[in-house]
Amino acid sequence: MNDYNHYFHFPREEWRKLEVSKDQILTAEELEEIRGLNDRISLQDISEIYLPLIKLIAIQYHEAIFIHGEKMEYLKKKESRAPFIIALAGSVAVGKSTTARVFKLMLDRWFSKTRQVELVTTDGFLYPNKVLEERGIMDKKGFPESYDRDRFAKFLTDLKANKEDVEVPLYSHFTYDVLDETRMMHNPDIVIIEGINVLQADQHESLYPSDFFDFSVYMDANEADIKNWYLERFFMLRETAFQDESSYFHPYTKISKKEAETFALGVWDTINGVNLKENIEKTKYRADLVLHKGTDHLISDIYLRK
C-alpha cells in the first residue's frame, strides 16, 4: 500500500521555505555529540528540515495547552495538562535515535529550557533476554511478542494520568539486555518516545499506544537503503564498541570479515528485514508525519497528515 492521499506532500525544496527563526539552530559541536554511528545528519538537515518541524510541534503543543485551559475553565477544574507525548517510529538503522536526540535538544532550545523535555526509548520495555530465551523467542527480539506490553501500557497510563513520578526501564545496547535499574521522570512537560514498535496496534489489547500520543513521526526509507545502513553500522561497531570483551557481540570480532558479513546478513534477512515488512512498515500511515530519507541519508520528502 502507498496511500498518502490524506497527507500533504512537501518535497524538501518546498518544506525548507517554511518561515522560521534561525536562532534555534544547533551548532556543529552539539550535532556531533548527539549524532549516531553512521548517521549522516547534517546542519543543513537541521536548518532545512528539523527547524520547521520543531516549530510545527511547538504550534501543536501550544494549541493543546490552550484547549486544555479552556476546557478546565469551562468545567471549573484546576487539573494541569498531562505531558505532551511525541512518538517516533521506524526501522532499525533508519536513524530514529539520532532524530529523537535532535528533537530533545531542539525543543529544549525552542522553549529556552522552560519546559521539561524527556526522552524515552521502548528498548527498555523489551523482556529481559532470560525471559526471551525461556519462551524460545530470542530470535524474535524486536517483534511485538518480545515486548512487555502491559508494562508499556502502564507507563503510558501513568503519564496521561498526570502521575508525578513515572518509572522508566533502561536498556543497554552494550550488553544487549534490559538493565535491572530504572530511572524516574518527575512531572515532564513533553515526552519523546522512540522505538520501532510505538505505532503498532494489537487487536487483542483494549488500549493502543497511539491513543496516548499527541504527535507521531515515522522515519521512512527504502528497505535496500536501510539494509545497507544496518550493515555499515554493524561493521563500524565491530571495529569499535564490539572490541570490548564485555560486549554481547564481542565474539563477532574474532571471526573473519566474511563470516561476520554472513552473520549480519542473516540477522537482517531473518529478523530485522522480516520485522520491518511484517510489523513496522505498515504503521507508517498511522503517523501524523512521515520523514522519507534518500540513499544519501538526506530527508527528501515530508508527508504531513491533513
From Swiss-Prot:
Keywords: ATP-binding, Coenzyme A biosynthesis, Cytoplasm, Kinase, Nucleotide-binding, Transferase. InterPro entries: P-loop_NTPase, PanK, PRK/URK. Pfam families: PRK. SUPFAM superfamilies: P-loop containing nucleoside triphosphate hydrolases. It catalyses: (R)-pantothenate + ATP = (R)-4'-phosphopantothenate + ADP + H(+). Pathway: Cofactor biosynthesis; coenzyme A biosynthesis; CoA from (R)-pantothenate: step 1/5. One of its GO terms (cellular component) is cytoplasm. GO terms for molecular function: ATP binding; pantothenate kinase activity. It is found in: Cytoplasm. ATP binds at residues 90-97. Signal peptide: none annotated. Its main location: cytoplasm. GO terms for biological process: coenzyme A biosynthetic process. Its EC number is 2.7.1.33. Belongs to the prokaryotic pantothenate kinase family. This is Pantothenate kinase.
